[in-house]
Amino acid sequence: MSVNRILVINPGSTSTKIGVFDNERPVLEETIRHDVEQIGKYKRIIDQYEFRKETILEVLHSHGINISKLNAVCGRGGLLRPIEGGTYTVNDAMLEDLKNGFSGHHASNLGGILAYEIASGLNIPAFIVDPVVVDEMEPVARISGIAGMERKSIFHALNQKAVARKVAEQLNHKYEDLNLLVTHMGGGITVGAHKKGRVIDVNNGLNGEGPFSPERAGTVPVGQLVEMCFSGEYYRDEMIKKLVGQGGLVSLIDTNDAIKVEQMVEKGDPEATLIYKAMAYQVAKEIGGASAVLHGKIDAIVLTGGLAYSKILVDEIKERVDWIADVIVHPGEDELEALAEGALRVLREEEAPKEYVVREKETVARG
């Protein structure tokens, strides 16, 4: 089998994770920490790309990686327009939306830009894979009870789909042939209903839907939320932080560290026990609801993400949902590996690269 060498790039706010893979085998994985003062010199996140590019190339050189031997570069997908899942070739339309922050400004927007900047000089393809804006929801799933307020698909698409593919392989099936309920449990929690390779419904783990998590409030009583918003006690930014960043475990028990909470549970702390059980309860309830989306025809329930390492949490969830389908636990996440696998599927011609196309304010994915 021929060897495809792939450089993968996952930019964070103050770091850039890079990896070099020979097919599925990691040759190099490194987290480049950026000096906060250095990063702070740039007014816009997008202005950091040249600095980050040079830093990446220096690190590769220091490890003896000859970039002329690369077959492709793959970056983390950023805040683009809603698109279906898959591996996309970085093109001019995508670069424009990433640079302009079409759906928001975030360090992940640098992923596609860095991939393109490095790949174009080598005359090799640049890709992104399954960004958080992946949207495969069916029309019926978009409707909310307020006109003009559609439900949106924002979730851990990269890890959910990567793990779903691994589970399908484990079950000796193709991802596109299975119905799976995949739950990513990390700083945020999302439960996706995967129908034959498409996530037809999923809770918006960023903007207040679904289970509460270590840092996010999830679904809350809306009437009380409105009262709080107009109480005069909080600014808008403070309310946003209550939902994302200072919600969930942070609000309820003053920590986002699930390991610490689990230790409290093991010591018999009644408050910690109730709150941790409530988080598991809400996850299980979300899984139960998602099972109805797939008419109860579920091949497996999958638990993944950092919290899937928690035996207490996993056992509590299993106890409530294992009657629906077998529960498969795939803890942790490996975004670098998932990016490499997405690029590899295209290089091996197992799937065609998709094209990011903007038409009349819409994005159309073409395979």
From Swiss-Prot:
Give the record's GO CC terms: cytoplasm
Chief localisation class:
cytoplasm
This protein's source sits in the domain of life called Bacteria
The catalytic activity, as recorded, is:
butanoate + ATP = butanoyl phosphate + ADP
Which terms in the Gene Ontology molecular function aspect does this entry carry?
Answer: acetate kinase activity; ATP binding; butyrate kinase activity
Q: Membrane-spanning residues where?
A: none
EC number, UniProt record = 2.7.2.7
**Which positions make up the signal peptide?**
none
What top-level class of enzyme does the UniProt entry assign?
A: transferase
Record keywords? ATP-binding, Cytoplasm, Kinase, Nucleotide-binding, Transferase
**Location(s) in or outside the cell:** Cytoplasm
Q: Which GO terms describe its biological process?
A: acetate metabolic process
NCBIfam families per the UniProt record, alphabetical: butyr_kinase (TIGR02707), PRK03011.1-5 (NF002834)
PANTHER family in alphabetical order: ACETATE KINASE, BUTYRATE KINASE 2-RELATED
The family note in this entry says: Belongs to the acetokinase family.
What name goes with this protein? Probable butyrate kinase
* Species for this entry: Bacillus cereus (strain B4264)
Which classification does the entry list for the species? Bacteria, Bacillati, Bacillota, Bacilli, Bacillales
